[in-house]
Regions:
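Ser/Thr/Gly/Pro-rich low-complexity, disordered linker/stalk segments of secreted
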Residues: 2-66
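Non-catalytic architectural context of zinc metalloproteases
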Residues: 12, 42, 62-113, 218-235, ...
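Generic detection of long, well-ordered alpha-helical segments
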Residues: 70, 110-117, 121, 252, ...
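Auxiliary, metal-adjacent structural segments of Zn-dependent hydrolase domains
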Residues: 88-161
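Active-site-flanking segments in enzyme catalytic domains
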Residues: 136-306
Length: 306
């Protein structure tokens, strides 16, 4: 007969966590598969991957800026203005529209700037250091206008003192004797300075007292005519005036004489062989020396009088 097994007699199944009574050992844990995480294990958080960065390019070596073209004329102008304390104007943009005495000026061309600026520099360098700064310090700044011509070559240059606090000298390229003209016009600026510095005296009486008896300037008598007193090679001893134009006014007389005082040498013998002209030159030189702080016995205009 089949024997009936009682449910109580069946061997009891053990769990992995129960200890084997026979050996006292715990059963080995059953391996788990990687795709089956334990239900009690914490979930691993998702961490985004860092995208790959491009390799940085090496820093380029800094290059110096490209050199700018040098404006030679403007550099020369700045040098003149800084050294001699005057203003210089040239070119259409700076001189067009300036029409003193109702005249018209024709502007320099760009290729003429440097040449005329160099001539002006060579003229100004003969004056004492700081000489033109005295004009500015006394409220009479001086400006040079460099132009091609004035009124269809009617003038080689002129002095404009419409406003005493803004003296102007216009010089033209067409003048072949630029240094003589420039020094003539500078004399007018000097006399304007002396008019103020010597006030209430004036610089002309002492000078004109040396003229011959009976002489009159054209400004005093439009019919005046004294050619016998004008310097000529065969009239040196009796010369009182350097040129015929010097007989126009006392100011023109002084300017015509001073321009020869500023020459390199006494080419025509005005000061060695003409005693009356020499005497007038000595008065003019002394007045300048006494009223300009920068002037003195070593000033260029004294050379021919020693």
């Amino acid at each position: 007969d089949k024997t009936k097994v009682n449910s109580q007699d069946k061997p009891k199944a053990t769990t992995p966590s129960e200890q084997n009574p026979a050996t006292g050992d715990k059963p080995k844990a059953q391996p788990t598969t990687p795709n089956q995480p334990q239900s009690n294990a914490p979930a691993t958080p998702h961490r985004p991957t860092t995208p790959s960065q491009p390799t940085p390019q090496p820093n380029p070596t800094p290059q110096p800026p490209a050199p700018q073209p040098v404006d030679l004329a403007n550099s020369l102008r700045q040098e003149i203005e800084a050294t001699y304390h005057v203003k210089v104007r040239y070119g259409a943009a700076e001189t067009n529209g300036y029409a003193p005495r109702h005249t018209a000026t024709q502007a320099l061309q760009p290729n003429q700037y440097v040449g005329m600026l160099n001539e002006l520099k060579n003229i100004l360098r003969r004056y004492p250091n700081g000489f033109f700064r005295e004009f500015r310090a006394n409220g009479m700044p001086l400006t040079f206008y460099l132009v091609d011509s004035v009124q269809n070559n009617a003038f080689a240059g002129f002095f404009d003192r419409q406003f005493v606090n803004d003296l102007k000298i216009v010089l033209t390229r067409k003048d072949y004797f630029l240094s003589l003209t420039a020094n003539h016009e500078i004399t007018h600026a000097i006399d304007t300075f002396l008019d103020i510095k010597m006030y209430p005296r004036e610089p002309y009486s002492e000078y004109t007292a040396l003229n011959p008896a009976g002489f009159k300037y054209l400004s005093e008598d439009q019919n005046a005519n004294f050619p016998q007193y004008v310097w000529k090679n065969d009239n040196r001893q009796n010369a009182y005036f350097a040129t015929a134009y010097a007989q126009s006014t006392p100011r023109e007389d002084r300017a015509e004489l001073f321009k020869f005082m500023m020459r390199d040498y006494d080419a025509v013998g005005i000061f060695n062989n003409s005693p009356y002209l020499r005497a007038k030159a000595q008065v003019l030189a002394r007045q300048i020396n006494q009223n300009f702080a920068t002037a003195g016995p070593n000033a260029y205009w004294n050379r021919l009088l020693k």
